[in-house]
């Protein structure tokens, strides 16, 4: 089981470099990340965006771009579309969000005839290495599905479970989060969490033990669970936490990143190819971890 994000890089370096289409690449943080991933032998990039801006930013960070393919586009929207098309054509195996808004990227990914849709729901998973936690923690969904219902949450959970299994977790422990641990019809997230737990018992969510509703404290702390009298196979040992909605998942993830010094990677599951999706403000380190994760997913799928 992978317990540290550095292990993603170590494992990915054993494979051939993955071809990555980078949408809206003309930004120093994006290019620094890509350059670092290239130097580590993780990827072969195709940079998509305004060519003159890409070259100017690359020159600023001291990257001469010799041998690097550039696909010129006039706008970020066009860059997202072109990068998706590179993946559809098989010229790249991974799509990476550069310096553009998430909704611009997702519109290209979700386009009915020209995107990367499959029969699965797309959802985002953050993989966090939190210094005070004993293993990697996956948080979903903090970037795509705004207010998912029970059906959507089941798909979101399954996507995260599948990712956890690819990281070497055999029996994935999932905490379906709410603000309290008992079912209250006035708090919909408690009902959703209880349904997810029962769905896992009935085999509708596979490969996981799901318990909920659980508040975050007793999801990640066995001591907190004992103090509240909660007996759960998940408490204190969760691999995945399913947030009630996008707002809470996003706030939780960034809270851990900025206040608990967590390191993170971000990936979109459910598309026809891995999609690296991090915040525009994330440091190069987060993007490199995400590229390593995407590379491993490609290798696992035989791409």
Task: Report residues per predicted region.
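Anion-binding alpha/beta catalytic cores of soluble intermediary-metabolism enzymes, centered on
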Residues: 1-234, 239-244, 248-303
